[in-house]
Each structure stands twice: as structure tokens, then as C-alpha cells.
């Protein structure tokens, strides 16, 4: 990675864990995002994401270690967070459907990689939305799913992290739990909360079971039931 080619235009975010810059490639004249993360990330996750892009995921352009920090260059994505969007006005049921189908698609994509990638921090703040198109971002605590490996650290966001994540375990069902919590949140932020809850309650209930073995065993199983209950309804 030739970091000197990326001119730092603005600091977008600063914390103890990371800095995020809006940068410009001085030769290609394109704008990107540069993340400086103050620990060593699993670069094999970024290798998988770079080699297997998806329309609802920011493209990974480059990555490297530098002085015990991880540097990630990603595609710049326009838009606001889903968290901000739902604070502005209620969602129409068709918007809820569109958001969820896009989310199912990208989560299914990362879960089907070899090995699967577990996001571990799916929440409205980590989803950008622009003109109805969503982008799942922030893979900093994501991991490759290796069945016999225990997580080194407990991670995730309170309210969205599955119970097993607090015990140092995470798998595909952990992401399904977070998707279920997110579904519940955007249903409550919709124009027609009560009728939507009546058809989606069982999906939310199943996906957010404390016992991970009682959740959907794949995100596509959850998507299939969502479509059966939600699709072709007139709102």
C-alpha cells in the first residue's frame, strides 16, 4: 500500500480505537475512506471482503499493517446512517421491506464466504442509506468463522450483540440475532407498526431467541419466512 498517494482531506471521526479520514487519491483523483485502527485486525477478513465484493458493502481497496496499527482504504459511500434516517420520519412498509431484503442479501453473502465472515456488530449505526440503497459498514470487529476457535475478546454493541458474544462465542446465528433486533427497531419506526408487528412478530421472536440453536439456522431461512409473510401485501 502506498499511503503517500492518499491525501487526507478531512478527519471524519476520532476515538481511542480508530481515526477515520476522508481522503483523495492524488493520481486517480477518487475519494475514499481511510481507517487507522489502533490494533492489529485480521487482514484475512479484509482479503475475503476485497476479493468478494457485494453491492451492499463498501469495496475494500487496500489494507496493511503499519507500526502496530491497521490501515484500511475503502470506497467512499454517500448517505446517512439508518439510525439517523429513522429518527427523521416514519418508514413506509415498502421501505422496511427494501431495507430488510438488502440486509438479508449482504449478510447471506458474507456468511457464504470460505470461511464465513461474521460481522458481529450489525446495528442501524453501521448501515448507511442513500436513495433507498443500503450499505453495511464497519467490519472492524468482524471475524472469520472457524468452528473450534473461541473469540479472543467479547465484542458487539449492547442491545444488538447476541448473548453468546458475551461468553466469547459468535457464529452466523449471532448476526441473525442482531438482524432480528434491527428488524424490531425499524418496525417500531414505521408508519404502520401494529399491522407490521402482527405479521412479523414470530420472525422477530425466532431470530432473537436466547438459545442460539432455536434461532433460524441461516439468514436465508429468515429471509424466506419474511417474504412469505410480508411480500405482496398492499400497504
Where are these regions (language model features)?
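Activation segment signature within eukaryotic-like protein kinase domains
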Residues: 99-100
Amino acid at each position: 500500500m502506498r499511503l503517500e498517494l492518499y491525501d487526507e482531506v478531512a478527519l471524519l471521526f476520532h476515538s481511542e480505537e480508530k481515526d477515520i479520514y476522508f481522503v483523495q487519491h492524488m493520481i486517480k483523483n477518487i475519494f475514499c475512506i481511510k481507517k487507522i485502527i489502533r490494533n492489529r485486525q485480521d487482514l484475512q477478513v479484509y482479503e475475503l471482503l476485497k476479493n468478494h465484493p457485494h453491492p451492499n458493502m463498501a469495496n475494500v481497496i487496500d489494507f496493511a499493517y503499519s507500526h502496530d496499527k491497521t490501515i484500511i482504504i475503502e470506497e467512499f459511500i454517500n448517505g446517512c446512517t439508518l439510525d439517523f434516517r429513522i429518527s427523521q420520519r416514519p418508514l413506509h412498509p415498502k421501505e422496511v421491506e427494501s431495507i430488510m431484503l438488502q440486509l438479508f442479501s449482504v449478510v447471506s453473502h458474507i456468511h457464504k464466504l470460505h470461511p464465513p465472515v461474521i460481522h458481529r456488530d450489525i446495528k442501524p449505526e453501521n448501515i448507511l442509506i442513500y436513495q433507498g440503497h443500503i450499505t453495511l459498514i464497519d467490519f472492524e470487529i468482524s471475524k472469520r468463522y472457524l468452528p473450534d476457535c473461541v473469540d479472543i475478546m467479547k465484542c458487539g454493541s449492547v442491545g444488538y450483540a447476541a448473548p453468546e458474544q458475551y461468553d466469547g462465542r459468535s457464529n452466523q446465528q449471532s448476526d441473525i440475532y442482531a438482524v432480528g433486533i434491527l428488524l424490531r427497531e425499524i418496525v417500531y419506526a414505521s408508519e404502520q407498526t401494529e399491522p407490521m408487528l402482527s405479521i412479523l412478530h414470530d420472525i422477530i421472536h425466532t431470530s432473537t431467541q436466547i438459545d442460539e440453536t432455536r434461532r433460524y439456522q441461516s439468514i436465508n431461512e429468515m429471509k424466506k419466512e419474511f417474504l412469505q409473510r410480508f411480500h405482496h401485501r398492499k400497504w
